C-alpha cells in the first residue's frame, strides 16, 4: 500500500488484520535493503510510506502482478500532521537530505505540502500503467475499503475492519 504517511496507514493495517486470507504488516521490512527490502510473502498487505522511494525496484519485482493501493487523506490534514514532526522522521529527511536545507528555510507546513505533492505525484506516475490498483481515501473509507476488500477477494470480518477506522492510531 503506497502512501505519504500521516494518512491512516496504521489504521489500514489494523483493518486488514480482520482479513483471514491475507497477512498484513506496517513497515515490516524497514531494516532490510536490496531485494530483501521488498521480499513480501504471497497474499500479504504491506503499509510503508517509504515504498514511494523504491518504486523502480517495486516495479521490477512485482510489475503489474500485485494489487496496488494508494491511500490518501486530505492534503491540509496530512500537512498539519507532518508539520508537527519537522524535526524527525521522513519530513526531516526530506528537508535536509532531499531539499538540502541545513536549517529551516521554509515553514514546516510548506515543506510538508511539497513532500506530500512530490510523493503523491511519484505514486500516481508509478500507478498510471497498473491494472490492479485502487485509491482509498480516509475521508470516504467506509465506501472505499469495502471496494478494496472485494477487489482482493478478502475473507474475514468486514464490519470489524470498518470499525477500526473510528479509532485514531498513531495520531499527531
Each model region followed by its residue ranges:
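Short catalytic-loop micro-motif centered on adjacent basic/acidic residues
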Residues: 44-46, 134-137
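C-terminal accessory extensions appended to soluble enzyme cores
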Residues: 153-172
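Short, solvent-exposed coil/turn segments
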Residues: 38-40, 109, 131, 169
Amino acid at each position: 500500500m503506497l502512501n505519504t504517511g500521516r494518512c491512516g496507514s496504521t489504521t489500514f493495517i489494523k483493518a486488514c488484520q480482520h482479513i483471514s486470507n491475507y497477512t498484513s504488516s506496517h513497515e515490516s521490512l524497514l531494516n532490510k535493503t536490496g531485494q530483501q527490502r521488498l521480499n513480501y510473502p504471497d497474499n500479504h498487505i504491506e503499509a510503508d510510506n517509504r515504498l514511494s522511494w523504491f518504486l523502480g525496484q517495486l516495479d521490477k519485482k512485482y510489475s503489474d502482478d500485485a494489487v496496488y493501493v494508494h491511500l490518501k487523506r486530505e492534503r491540509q490534514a496530512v500537512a498539519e500532521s507532518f508539520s508537527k514532526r519537522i524535526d524527525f522522521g521522513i519530513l526531516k529527511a526530506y528537508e535536509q537530505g532531499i531539499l538540502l536545507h541545513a536549517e529551516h528555510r521554509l515553514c514546516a507546513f510548506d515543506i510538508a505540502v511539497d513532500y506530500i505533492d512530490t510523493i503523491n505525484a511519484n505514486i500516481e506516475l508509478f500507478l498510471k500503467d497498473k491494472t490492479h490498483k485502487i485509491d482509498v481515501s480516509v475521508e470516504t473509507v467506509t465506501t472505499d475499503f469495502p471496494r478494496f476488500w472485494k477487489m482482493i477477494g478478502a475473507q474475514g470480518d468486514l464490519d470489524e475492519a470498518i470499525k477500526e477506522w473510528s479509532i485514531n492510531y498513531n495520531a499527531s
